[in-house]
Amino acid sequence: MKPQQLATQKFSEHCGYSAAQTVFAPGRVNIIGEHTDYNDGFVMPCAINYGMAVSFSKRDDSVWRVYAIDIDEQDEFDLSRPIEPSEHKWANYVRGVVKYIQEKCPEFKQGADLAMTSDVPMSSGLSSSAALEISIGKTARVLGDLPLSLTEIALIGQQAENKFVGANCGNMDQLTSALGQKDQVIMIDCRSLDITPTPVPHGYSIAIINSNVKHDLVTGEYNSRRQECEFAARFFGVKALRDVTSERFIERAAELQAQNELAYKRAKHIISENQRVLEAVEALKANDMVKLGQLMAGSHDSMRDDFEITIPEIDYLVELAQVAIGKNGGARMTGGGFGGCIVCLVPDEKVEHLRRIIADNYEKQTGIKETFHLCTACDGVHLI
């Protein structure tokens, strides 16, 4: 059963009446451009046909009663009172979005019953958290008829995750869930928020293979990577690493390396990755899938060697996929790192070969069974 249908059904069972409306917000997969978003750089994701559905109806008070179907938990809070953190981690994504919507729209106090469910795997690097944030933001906009653009909702989602949940994410995930376009990858300039859509190549599929090694980015490694990037930006005297050219980096690389080896390696990844994204857009426009495959491979190598966010299981999956796909197409880790998924752009005629190669080897090598998803690029958040 699709999340949209399940949300509607479970709302009726849990609340005792039928939901008025349902919102769907997609997850996302990032084709190339990893950890560049919080460095004001470039990314090239697409929204995918897995996401979060929220069925909801207005109440005649200011209470939000939120039922999380997948874990059978409920959270309740009152919009007429200051919104405080919940003991449930998932509920803080909801509360955080509503809290920061109220900062922009102080009059918003419309209560609601909500039931939500997702088919985005948790901690997989496919933005289950952003899908939750954007679905809640859209729900609030509908409930209160609020004058918020989808871009504003995306930035509120990022703010909630940064300040209320405590994860220093960039803005790519939320922008993609809000603004995705059917059959398009979208290059996002994470500083200007300009979007450049480019069609997914005809005859190619997007395959996402989940290593089923889970990560949790709220603590530790993700935030330390961000701090190392900020150190490098201060070293170069710029607002963000987006502003450092390859030439300038090379000129001062030895000096940075002597001061801070990790900051040097992180900056090397970010600066080269931004260039790869720009080249990937041109490769897609030219339908040059050999070039795109090379760029994806370069991105993965850089994440492994310089940003140091891959793990052996992910590296092995990428090796298998690259062999199965060949030169026309590519594979790399996608998401924050330390587990999660790889993304593949694979010729349609090689999809089953890829599936078989992975199935025959990955579990045998790692003791973990992968999950294989074929995805389509889809529209961003919408009412159903």
From Swiss-Prot:
Substrate binds at E34, H35, T36, D37, Y222. The record marks R28 as: Transition state stabilizer. The active site is at D173 (proton acceptor). It is found in: Cytoplasm. GO terms for molecular function: ATP binding; galactokinase activity; magnesium ion binding. ATP binds at S123, S124, G125, L126, S127, S128, S129. Mg(2+) binds at S129, E161. Its EC number is 2.7.1.6. It holds the Pfam family GHMP_kinases_C. The keyword Methyltransferase does not apply. It catalyses: alpha-D-galactose + ATP = alpha-D-galactose 1-phosphate + ADP + H(+). Pathway: Carbohydrate metabolism; galactose metabolism. It comes from the Bacteria. GO terms for biological process: galactose metabolic process. Keywords: ATP-binding, Carbohydrate metabolism, Cytoplasm, Galactose metabolism, Kinase, Magnesium, Metal-binding, Nucleotide-binding, Transferase. One of its GO terms (cellular component) is cytosol. Belongs to the GHMP kinase family. GalK subfamily. Catalyzes the transfer of the gamma-phosphate of ATP to D-galactose to form alpha-D-galactose-1-phosphate (Gal-1-P). This is Galactokinase. It comes from Actinobacillus pleuropneumoniae.
